[in-house]
Amino acid sequence: MASTLPVQTLPLILILLAVLAPGTADFNISSLSGLLSPALTESLLIALPPCHLTGGNATLMVRRANDSKVVKSDFVVPPCRGRRELVSVVDSGSGYTVTRLSAYQVTNLTPGTKYYISYRVQKGTSTESSPETPMSTLPRKNMESIGLGMARTGGMVVITVLLSVAMFLLVVGLIVALHWDARK
């Protein structure tokens, strides 16, 4: 005798699929951990959308705080090469580390300003979006306020002279040592 359980559960499964996958889903822009600073003075580094949206048409929306104007930028979500992290270690050894940066850079921003960033990605018939994430650019420092110390001044001249004298003494010592060795 065949069970009627699969036939009875099919409508329930279809209803759950319709309710749980309405066509618009949310994803979060990653927390940007592992990066020294995602913010620069006139640009921001933003994590790419998740891997399941590869090939989708992404719209990055940037809104300045206390402003209603939204600047949009469209691009195709690039394919994933391994896990999608903002910064991933590609190779490490012998005292060096090679990393790959998987981010979208928003440029031409105002220094020291707060922005709200969000994505909307359309892939096929479904559209997914991220909530607005606040990010701020770094303030621009006045050039005169940056302490240079002895950069490009007497310190460099002194080091260059000391190294030149030491090199001269090494060459003279090598010539004298070779000359004495040839006498014996």
Curated annotation (Swiss-Prot):
Tell me the first and last residues of the signal peptide.
1-25
Q: Which residues are glycosylated?
A: N28, N57, N66
Q: Which residues form the propeptide?
A: 26-84
**Transmembrane stretches, start-end:** 156-180
Write out the annotated subcellular location.
Cell membrane
User: Which segments of the protein form a coiled coil according to its record?
Assistant: none
Positions on the Lumenal side per record topology: 85-155
GO CC terms: apical plasma membrane; apical plasma membrane urothelial plaque
The UniProt entry, under CDD domains, shows: UP_II (cd09967)
Keyword Hydrolase attributed = no
Q: Cytoplasmic topology: which positions? A: 181-184
Q: Which UniProt keywords apply?
A: Cell membrane, Cleavage on pair of basic residues, Glycoprotein, Membrane, Signal, Transmembrane, Transmembrane helix
> Oligomeric state and partners?
Interacts with uroplakin-1a (UPK1A).
Q: What is this protein called?
A: Uroplakin-2
Instruction: Specify the taxonomic lineage.
Output: Eukaryota, Metazoa, Chordata, Craniata, Vertebrata
Primary gene name? Upk2
